[in-house]
Amino acid sequence: MRIIFSLIFLTTPALAWEFTPTPICTLSHTEPTVDIAVTYDHATHLYAIAVTSPDGWPDAAAFSIRFDGAQPNTISTTRHSTEANTLIVTDVGFGNVLDGLEFNATATAFTQTAAVTVSLMGAAPEVQKFRACATAPVA
């Protein structure tokens, strides 16, 4: 019985939030219905969030992210683009996005006709590493 449970856990994809500092600061998370990547590039001084859904993203006038939990907030923009199944937003500041990811339980990315929700369980320590990377001096 233990072997069966071990095999199940080994073949189940990890749903953890992950931070990597190279080649650029990256915070990522994968669930069956969505992949999210938040990046910061010291060379361009731009933050980006890419939300990939297997169902794609229809053309929409606005894109929003709603954070539910201890510090609820909704952030909206009309400055987004889509490439294949990925919706992308770039900006010079992402404080509200990072706060939402760090201090809440779920995030729902949505347009007028499509939405995906992700768990933020375990995101906080990875967001803190991402923040440190984004503010670290570059030689």
Language model region names:
Residues 3-13:
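Sec-dependent N-terminal signal peptides
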Residues 13-15, 73:
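N-terminal processing/targeting junctions
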Residues 15-16, 100:
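Generic detector of isolated residues embedded in canonical secondary-structure elements
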Residues 16-60:
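An ectodomain-focused feature that recognizes extracytoplasmic/extracellular
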Residues 69-139:
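Internal interaction segment
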